[in-house]
């Protein structure tokens, strides 16, 4: 028995030392939405969709690109400036600027930009949906923690009552008014109450860990929730939460319904994009270009070497009046030296000016036959519209079913709460009468323990029903689009 009291004292000390900052529901929800991995992933997808939407809007503007090249050529090659074959080493450089723009394609670019923008908006509503789902889950886990904490308190009160009974019974046994069996029965009950307390406290800690996991918090960090007054939690009347009214509001407030409406609009615009593939495309394009080249060697003059055959390797001759005459031509040696770095770039600006060229042109592409791809794309786009419409309809039907189910669950929860409240009142009266009869020796300790356990079970059940009722009413509020309010 002494070890039992020591164990109970240790649990009480652990609770007393829990002085960490307490988290209320609002803080839990905000933290979960900000740090939950699923919310982060949805947010990344929304940002990607926003980038795609921005890029699609810019596609209607002209595309412009510039280019430049610098290099050296060796051996036999074509000089890009003179277009003549050359065997000397030379430096070359070129510049270019080109651009193009689509002028007409049955609104393909504009409609594509609209589709991308709608998809970006739908992705944002996906983030809201996941955040809403996380908020509702946090509220459920939070209420579960509160219920577990209250259950710990109930078991503590139970232990206190049993300890009081133990003290009274021990005195009466010592006085010879009761047999020792009564004392043994109370001691057994105290051990049972202690076991219930330990189980309740362990369940509370496990629920705390579950909530930390949902919040993506480190389990090693101390964490405790704030306990609001359960009687001050605002609960609307059923008149404000009639399922037909809640459903009409939910159609305009629930993120999934918003996303479905947006995606249906995007699917219809995608039909126009697919249809554009069957129409001609008119585009305009042009470019500006210039180049420069220069040999690594420069000519400094020529040296006269004498005369030689007009055609090297052949004795060229002509006959005049029967007399042969040999034809010779002067021979020269071209003198060249290497250019230095500054000389290589001689005439750079002049060459670029002389070689500057421009062109502009229009292009018309008319789809004649493409293996039925354009027609198939158009048909798929129309079928996709019907598919999205069915998805939207199914989601609305599911929403309506969920709302009516939530309303029925809330009604049943209220009935269970009322019944359990009456059960507590009855059990409390029975226990009070039993305690008085036990004090005067008109009731056995076993009967007293039975009444005490009945009261404990009634209180635990009432507590569970109360938090269950609050959560189910919050679910209805959630469908109205008002979020978690306590």
Regions found by a protein language model. Name each.
Residues 74, 219, 296-306, 340-344, ...:
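Acidic, low-complexity, intrinsically disordered peripheral segments
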Residues 93-99, 246, 358-364:
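Hydrophobic, lipid-facing positions within transmembrane beta-strands of outer-membrane proteins
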Residues 70-74, 103, 288-292, 366-368, ...:
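Transmembrane beta-strands of outer-membrane beta-barrel pores
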Residues 133-249, 409, 413, 433, ...:
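Periplasmic alpha-helical coiled-coil/stalk elements that build and connect Gram-negative outer-membrane
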Residues 44, 58, 195-217, 421-482:
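Short segments within alpha-helical structural elements
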Residues 1-25, 36, 484-486:
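Bacterial Sec-dependent N-terminal signal peptides
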Residues 40-44, 57-58, 89, 103-131, ...:
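Sec/SRP-type N-terminal targeting helices
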């Amino acid at each position: 028995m002494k070890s039992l009291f020591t164990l109970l004292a240790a649990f009480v000390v652990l609770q007393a030392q829990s002085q960490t900052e307490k988290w209320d529901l609002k803080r839990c929800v905000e933290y979960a939405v900000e740090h939950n991995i699923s919310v982060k992933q949805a947010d990344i997808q929304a940002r990607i969709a926003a980038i795609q939407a921005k890029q699609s809007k810019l596609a209607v503007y002209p595309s412009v690109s510039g280019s430049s090249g610098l290099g050296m050529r060796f051996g036999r090659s074509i000089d890009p400036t003179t277009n003549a074959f050359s065997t000397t080493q030379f430096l070359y450089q070129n510049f270019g600027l080109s651009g193009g723009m689509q002028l007409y394609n049955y609104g393909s670019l504009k409609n594509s930009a609209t589709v991308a923008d709608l998809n970006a908006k739908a992705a944002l509503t996906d983030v809201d949906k996941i955040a809403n789902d996380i908020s509702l889950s946090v509220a459920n886990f939070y209420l579960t923690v509160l219920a577990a904490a209250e259950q710990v308190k109930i078991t503590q009160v139970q232990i206190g009552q049993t300890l009081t009974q133990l003290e009274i019974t021990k005195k009466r046994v010592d006085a010879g008014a009761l047999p020792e069996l009564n004392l043994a029965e109370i001691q057994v009950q105290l051990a049972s109450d202690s076991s219930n307390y330990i189980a309740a406290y362990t369940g509370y800690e496990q629920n705390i860990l579950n909530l930390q996991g949902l919040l993506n918090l480190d389990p090693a960090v101390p964490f405790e929730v704030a306990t609001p007054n359960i009687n001050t939690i605002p609960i609307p009347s059923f008149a404000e939460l009639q399922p037909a009214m809640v459903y009409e509001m939910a159609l305009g407030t629930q993120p999934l319904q918003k996303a479905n409406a947006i995606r249906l609009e995007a699917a219809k615009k995608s039909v126009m994009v697919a249809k554009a593939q069957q129409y001609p495309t008119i585009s305009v394009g042009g470019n500006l270009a210039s180049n420069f080249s220069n040999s690594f060697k420069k000519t400094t003059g020529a040296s006269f070497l004498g005369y030689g055959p007009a055609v090297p390797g052949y004795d060229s001759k002509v006959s005049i009046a029967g007399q042969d005459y040999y034809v010779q031509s002067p021979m020269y040696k071209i003198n060249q030296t290497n250019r230095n770095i500054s000389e290589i770039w001689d005439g750079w600006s002049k060459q670029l000016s002389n070689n500057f060229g421009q062109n502009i042109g229009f292009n018309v592409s008319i789809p004649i036959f493409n293996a039925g791809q354009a027609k198939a794309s158009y048909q798929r786009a129309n079928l996709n519209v019907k598919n999205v419409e069915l998805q939207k309809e199914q989601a609305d039907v599911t929403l309506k079913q969920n709302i009516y189910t939530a309303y029925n669950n809330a009604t049943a929860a209220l009935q269970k709460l009322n019944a359990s409240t009456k059960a507590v009142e009855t059990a409390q009266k029975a226990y009070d009468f039993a305690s008085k009869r036990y004090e005067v020796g008109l009731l056995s300790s076993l009967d007293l323990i039975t009444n005490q356990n009945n009261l404990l079970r009634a209180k635990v059940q009432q507590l569970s029903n109360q938090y269950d009722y609050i959560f189910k009413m919050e679910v209805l509020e959630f469908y109205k689009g008002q979020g978690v309010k306590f």
